[in-house]
């Protein structure tokens, strides 16, 4: 039990959402409960997480969700553990909501160095229709920046994806590489605009950052085979794009490509049973696919070491495995799936009236 990781769950308490200040202590190790010294309320370790108030043993739930995150079909889990299919679906939905909250709290906090971002879409067959899953990847850290599920492959889908990319970090020096879909450059030149402050009265004009670069790799097919690849620079100069590619990919001969996000798509197809081609484990609703996407994506970011991110120690020559979240400086160690499912994410701080307590004023001044 780690009190420094917890915060008070009482929304009426002035210490709600504040962690690492010493006001949360262990109340009961047997029941795994904490207590806030400010409001004297106690709360269980799993409050507000995916494992809160589940009647099944916690270890069994984590094992089931681990199998789902590694691509095991729900029907196989039902047959192996003797569970009801609706129970497994409910656990997956709760895990997906928890992973989305963790992603919004840590990845979309605006602290990621993007450098180069690649985006692409997956066509997913579901029962009675088709869905599109759009994803974005930060190339230097291999960090998954989020995904969006939609019934149509249109500008609204791409706009929602690029808004998630913008929330992850600054776009002042960003290279966006995509395929030939026309919605990408059109929406990027809108989403990445920022107010240009001049000090004059009135609404400021929206302008694009000078360091924003947009490039496309357009593939031409003939007889269902790749015939040629046309590389087009939509915004910026060819020299600036080549320099950004060399910096973010570590190769002077790098060209405009979407290879990194396509490799991520292959990972998603392997780790999400509904994404497998010609599968019998198709989903019926978009919400089910979205829950699985967040579970697999968060596990990819925080739990699964990436081979290209490992580093060799200088003193003994050992390889140190790292996750994309470690490469992006969002955490200092690989998480277990239990850590991911029980990570406490504070909600929005409620508006309060009245005088603030003395300890809060002292903490504000100390910060």
Language-model region placement:
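Residue-level recognition of single "structural anchor" positions
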Residues: 1-367
